[in-house]
Regions:
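N-terminal Rossmann-like NAD(P)+-binding subdomain of aldehyde/semialdehyde dehydrogenases
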Residues: 1-115
Length: 117
């Protein structure tokens, strides 16, 4: 079972400030396949504040730097493709091949299109 209870805010994995947890049920087995946090207003406010604070420096990032970051992201994303396909398969109850092609692999295509803009 995947245990995903933290949020990635301002460059770090942080525990929720408010909110609750929710079980994710695999519809093919009706078993809990993950436990996730449901953030509250304070969590949203913290994420938005971090994004606003990052905007100034990010807006000064060159196209070449952004492309390099996207390429690194794509490398990591593709290295975890099977893991993502498995998680998607569990949360949707979909066959693994469908989860891989319709969900996990489509992210690679979207990222490649951004790299080539």
């Amino acid at each position: 079972m995947i245990d995903t209870k933290k949020f990635y805010i301002n460059g770090a994995w942080v525990a929720p400030l408010t909110g609750s947890e929710m079980d994710v049920i695999d519809p093919s087995t009706e078993q809990v396949c993950a436990v996730i946090s449901i953030g509250g207003q304070a969590d949203t406010d913290a994420a938005v504040a971090a994004a606003k604070a990052a905007l100034d420096s990010w807006s000064q990032t060159s196209k070449a730097q952004r492309v390099a970051l996207l390429k690194k992201f794509l490398e990591i994303y593709q290295s975890r493709n099977e893991e993502m396909g498995y998680a998607i398969s569990q949360e949707m109850g979909a066959p693994i091949d469908m989860a891989l092609t319709s969900q996990a692999e489509s992210g690679s295509g979207h990222t490649l299109s951004l790299i080539h803009i």
